[in-house]
Amino acid sequence: MKDLLPDLCDLYPEKLQIAEPIFTSYGKRSHFYGEVVTVSCFEDNSRVRELVAENGKGKVMVIDGGGSKRRALLGDMLAEKAVDNGWEGFVINGAIRDIAAQSQLNIGIHALCAHPMPTEKRGLGDLGKTLRFAGMTIAQGDYIYCDLNGIVVSKQPLALP
């Protein structure tokens, strides 16, 4: 496994936002990247459920759950659907669950923590909004790169080393 982020930081220091080191890698793929699709939701993963059913090839779903550690925004069933629909991964400012199952899925997942409680399903949340967390501002259509070194965001796609 190659360390992608140190190389990107060497090559493009002026083009990157670097996330505060608050995330843990949970998916089988610790190294992933793609075009950002944003979701803003607090303890309700209804919009996440909608998006994983869509084609996610080349895309990473970035979910701002307000940093809540009381409800899991992603479980194994939604993660499996995301794999089936080609999503590259998830970056979640919140919790996930079903850690053992998700660790076996061929997808990248960075989240704050694990928590066994599911979300409420109230149909709440927003798609496509600009998000602010972990010291970054992330817009729909930005590009995100993740590995075990952390997370970086760029306004345009970067040539990989």
Swiss-Prot record:
Cofactor binding, per record: Divalent metal cation.
Record's subunit section: Homotrimer.
One Pfam family per UniProt: RraA-like
GO molecular function, one term: metal ion binding
NCBIfam families recorded: NOT-MenG, PRK09372.1, PRK12487.1
EC number: 4.1.3.17, 4.1.1.112
Descriptive protein name: Putative 4-hydroxy-4-methyl-2-oxoglutarate aldolase
Annotated family: Belongs to the class II aldolase/RraA-like family.
InterPro entries, per database record: RraA, RraA/RraA-like, RraA/RraA-like_sf
UniProt-listed Gene3D superfamilies: Ribonuclease E inhibitor RraA/RraA-like
Swiss-Prot/TrEMBL cofactor(s): a divalent metal cation
